[in-house]
Amino acid sequence: MGRSDKLVKNISFIVIGNIGSKLMGFFMLPFYTNWLSPADYGTTDLLIVYANLLLNVVACDMSDAIYIYPVGATKQKVCNYYSTGFIFQFLCSIICLFVFWGISYLSMKNIFIDNIWFIYGILISNVFQKYTQDFCRGINQMSVFSFTGIVQTITTTLLSFLLIPTQGVYGFVLATIGANIATALFTFFYSNSYKYLSINDWDKEALTEMLRFSIPLIPTSILWWLISGLNRPLLEDYVGLFALGLMAVAGKLPGIMNLIFNFFQQAWIVTVVEEYKKLDFAIYYNKMFQMIM
């Protein structure tokens, strides 16, 4: 298979794999606006914004490391990477639980504190869903990666229709958490990832190696959040949740254009990892860079 064909194939896998997590918010928009008031939709948008901010911080962006280091590694080394990253994320989740518990006792009143356990549920379920899905990219199971997007799409749709019309914001949170958990479990077993998981494979050197790669990525994630999401918490105090909900709806269509480039970027990273050690990699890389520019 030629490099261009491989890149196109990876793009198709990435698009399908992200249908549930990235595109469902757009496709379900007519239903969300029918089921939820503008204020309620503004609340759900803020919950997702806060969860997205904390996603890479709480997990130290470990999901980005887990699809890089297994490439070309021995099976034992892959087990070390996967088990170490998985256990590390579990420990981070426990620490986050206690931090959130402490924050919940603050006397301040805002969307974050009032819905702190909703945010925690969305955050942690998303951490493990993203980790298990991205691991498939690291072990060259892109077809499984894409199929998980279909699973997440189906579960999100079903749970949304079942829960949101009667439960409102609470139903939205349950549907999001349920879809993340279902997708993570499906990926974990369907990709045979469980075969790579063992507490005995914990490796301090592997953890250090992955953290050296992932921690420098955290500021980039935060800066992207500041660009795309900081206005939400600020506007909450100035214009209220009703106006925030209208703004969230209006921003869905322009956000699709950003997603299109994001899909290409993810597929390009996968292709670069696969081609990196080949002799003519520099020529190929520069050619693609000139084409994009």
PLM regions with names:
Residues 53, 57, 90-94, 98, ...:
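Alpha-helical transmembrane segments of multi-pass membrane proteins
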Residues 5-63, 97, 101, 152-157, ...:
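Signature of the first transmembrane helix
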Residues 35-38, 109, 138-139, 166, ...:
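Helix-loop interface residues and adjacent transmembrane-helix termini in multi-pass membrane transporters
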Residues 4, 8, 69-74, 124-148, ...:
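Membrane-interface junctions at transmembrane-helix termini in multi-pass inner-membrane proteins
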Residues 70-87, 246-293:
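Specific pore-lining/lateral-gate transmembrane helices of multi-pass inner-membrane transport
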Residues 1-7, 117, 143, 185-228, ...:
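Interhelical loop/hinge segments that connect adjacent transmembrane helices in multipass membrane
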